[in-house]
Structures are given as C-alpha cells and as structure tokens.
Regions:
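Short, hydrophobic alpha-helical segments
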Residues: 34, 38, 137-145
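ATP-dependent small-molecule kinase phosphotransfer cores
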Residues: 1-42, 46-53, 90-93
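ATP-dependent NMP and nucleoside kinases share a basic, alpha-helical "lid"
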Residues: 32-83
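Small-molecule kinase domains that catalyze NTP-dependent phosphoryl transfer to phosphate-bearing small molecules
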Residues: 24, 80-133, 137-140
Length: 146
C-alpha cells in the first residue's frame, strides 16, 4: 500500500512507528545514522518528549528550538513548495494545534519540546538574523563547530 505524501500521513506513520517500537524509535534511528558519520550532527524535527528523553540519555546533546509567528511560518512553508506543505492556513493551524500538546511521550507535543529546549531562537526576522543568534550560542558551547 502506497502512502500519500503529506503532513497528515507522515504524522500518522510516525505515531504508529512510535506506538509499535517505543516513543523514541524514529529519533533513535536518526541518531544511529548520525553516529555512523562520526561528526557533530543536527537532527531536525524533534517533536515528542520521548525523543528528547532518549537523546538526553545519550550524552552530549543540545536541544535548539526555533519558533516564529504562525503566519510567518505558514508563508515560509508555502515558499518552499513541498508536497507535504500544500495546505490552507486554516489546516496549517489545525495541524499545529494537533501537534502542540499531548501527555503521551510518543505523540507530538511541540509546546513541551520548545519548553525543554536548551536554547530558543525566535525566527521572525531574516536568515541572517537567525544565523547571528545561532552563532552566538555555538560560540559558547564546548565542542568544535565543524
């Protein structure tokens, strides 16, 4: 059976994988791939508290959250023209609401993930402004930037 490539199908597939294999299954697979490269790595789209707990247990891990005004985030996803982002603003907001809060560590809870971040970047400006925020934080961390 072929899945339709959209945010909804990806949401349900990831939730099913976490339900079947544990709340950190998806992120643990990505972590394994990152370790195989043997360099500093960035894993994006951490969405559950179970994923955060797993990564925190592995050692040198920093959680960066990037947030922006919902309208601006919507405009940006429309510009990238991804198949998974072809939604109305109302559906975008519904998806955000669905992924914002959950007591289940294997289900997206973006508000808790943002709250658990070591560093929060507000991305309401330009890329240059975001990069400047990130550079300031990276310069304070105890590992070489590659």
């Amino acid at each position: 059976m072929k899945l339709t490539l959209n945010r909804d199908s990806m949401f349900h597939l990831a939730n099913r994988l976490r339900a079947e294999h544990g709340p950190s299954y998806v992120i643990d697979q990505l972590y394994g791939k990152a370790c195989a490269v043997n360099k500093n790595s960035i894993i994006e789209s951490i969405r559950t508290t179970g994923e955060i707990a797993s990564l925190r247990g592995k050692g040198r891990f920093y959680l960066f959250a990037v947030d922006a005004d919902p309208r601006l985030r919507y405009e940006r996803i429309q510009l990238r023209k991804s198949e998974t982002d072809a939604v109305s603003f109302d559906l975008f907001l519904e998806n955000e609401k669905r992924e914002s809060v959950s007591a289940d560590p294997g289900v997206p809870n973006l508000r808790a993930c943002i709250g658990a971040a070591d560093f929060l970047f507000v991305n309401n400006g330009s890329k240059t402004e975001l990069y400047q925020q990130v550079d300031v934080i990276l310069s304070t961390l105890d590992f070489p930037v590659q």
